[in-house]
């Protein structure tokens, strides 16, 4: 396995670790509605950071974006909006299926759809079937899916042991939402694929290869921001128990506390895709679809490890922790299989 591929896998791991941890600051926000908290964090992660970093990277910010036709920008934007819809469905999936089953089904579907649909769309699916490297990466995707399933089972055992149940368990509704969440969340993978002309244009302007994907986030995350912020603002306006004005009428120190924590959560959310871009840049072009598989499987891996570090599994008993550990090992094995496949 080459150093470039190893570093690509490593940066995807770092990005996934940030994704697994990003909600921790949000949990410390006090006396704010989820909608206000999510909006503040989202403005930081989907608007301020992508625009600020792109402005630093590009020699002429407006000239860069105005150089693309609508036919180039629109698919990137719409796939970003597609991801935004998946993001909203994610919370509803947890409500009706519970954390473990909801995450397992949604992540499993988005891993498959986001990874395998990209080469199909590009007409390169034969690479997966007809080459040794392609077959190995395909095997790695399958092993990763098994690992996600094992970690999901560990979560179910933990919830059963600790008496944790879904907020409003509804299998039929939950499964529909989980499938929708999995499919729509893959929009981020499709957006990155559609944004290749933007990456190439950034490279032509002299942007470092590690950073060429970052300017496309202005458009991708702009699409996601409209969906997420629109959802939050509509609820803040229509739901009687929610009030943006009330949330910002608290004591000034508490408002500052909440804004800073929400902004930190937004920063950590953004960093997952900052390092995703670094990892993506190190993956061989013919296997770039594997970036999504690495990100999603490492997200599950890091989520399990973070849960252990935060002692969320302390009262779960030995069996759930053993199953979780097995699932984490399987995901690590999957990453190595994929790495060896890309090296062929």
Curated annotation (Swiss-Prot):
It is found in: Cell inner membrane. It catalyses: L-rhamnopyranose(in) + H(+)(in) = L-rhamnopyranose(out) + H(+)(out). The chain crosses the membrane at residues 4-24, 38-58, 68-88, 101-121, 137-157, 175-195, 214-234, 259-279, 290-310, 323-343. Coiled coil: none annotated. Keywords: Cell inner membrane, Cell membrane, Membrane, Sugar transport, Symport, Transmembrane, Transmembrane helix, Transport. It is a multi-pass membrane protein. GO terms for molecular function: rhamnose transmembrane transporter activity; symporter activity. One of its GO terms (cellular component) is plasma membrane. InterPro entries: L-rhamnose-proton_sym_RhaT (IPR004673). It comes from the Bacteria. HAMAP family: RhaT. Uptake of L-rhamnose across the cytoplasmic membrane with the concomitant transport of protons into the cell (symport system). NCBIfam families: PRK13499.1-1 (NF010021), PRK13499.1-3 (NF010023), RhaT (TIGR00776). Belongs to the L-rhamnose transporter (TC 2.A.7.6) family. This is L-rhamnose-proton symporter. The lineage of its organism: Bacteria, Pseudomonadati, Pseudomonadota, Gammaproteobacteria, Enterobacterales. The gene is rhaT.
């Amino acid at each position: 396995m080459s150093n470039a591929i190893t570093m690509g896998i490593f940066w995807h791991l770092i990005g996934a670790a940030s994704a697994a941890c990003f909600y921790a600051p949000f949990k410390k926000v006090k006396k704010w509605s989820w909608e206000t908290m999510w909006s503040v964090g989202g403005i930081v992660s989907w608007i301020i950071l992508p625009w600020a970093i792109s402005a630093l990277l590009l020699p002429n910010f407006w000239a860069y974006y105005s150089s693309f036709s609508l036919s180039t920008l629109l698919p990137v934007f719409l796939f970003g909006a597609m991801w935004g819809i998946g993001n909203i469905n994610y919370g509803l999936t947890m409500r009706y299926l519970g954390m473990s089953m909801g995450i397992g089904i949604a992540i499993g579907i988005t891993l498959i759809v986001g990874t395998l649909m990209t080469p199909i769309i590009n007409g390169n699916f034969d690479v997966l079937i007809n080459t040794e490297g392609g077959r190995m990466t395909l095997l790695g995707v399958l092993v990763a899916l098994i690992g996600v399933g094992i970690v999901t089972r560990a979560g179910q055992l933990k919830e059963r042991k600790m008496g944790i149940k879904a907020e409003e368990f509804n299998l039929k509704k939950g499964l529909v939402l989980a499938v929708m969440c999995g499919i729509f969340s893959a929009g981020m993978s499709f957006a990155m694929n559609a944004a290749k002309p933007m990456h190439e244009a950034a490279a032509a302007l002299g942007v470092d290869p590690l950073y060429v994907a970052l300017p496309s986030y202005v458009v991708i995350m702009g699409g996601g921001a409209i969906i997420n912020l629109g959802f939050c603002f509509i609820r803040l306006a229509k739901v009687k128990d929610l009030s943006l004005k009330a949330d910002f009428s608290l004591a000034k120190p508490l408002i500052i506390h909440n804004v800073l924590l929400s902004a930190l959560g937004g920063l950590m959310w953004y960093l997952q895709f900052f390092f995703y871009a670094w990892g993506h840049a190190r993956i061989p072009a013919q296997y770039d679809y594997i970036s999504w598989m690495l990100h999603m499987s490492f997200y599950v891996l890091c989520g399990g490890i973070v849960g252990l570090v935060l002692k969320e599994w302390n009262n779960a008993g030995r069996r759930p922790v053993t199953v979780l550990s097995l699932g984490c090992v399987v995901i690590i094995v999957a990453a190595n299989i994929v790495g060896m496949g890309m090296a062929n």
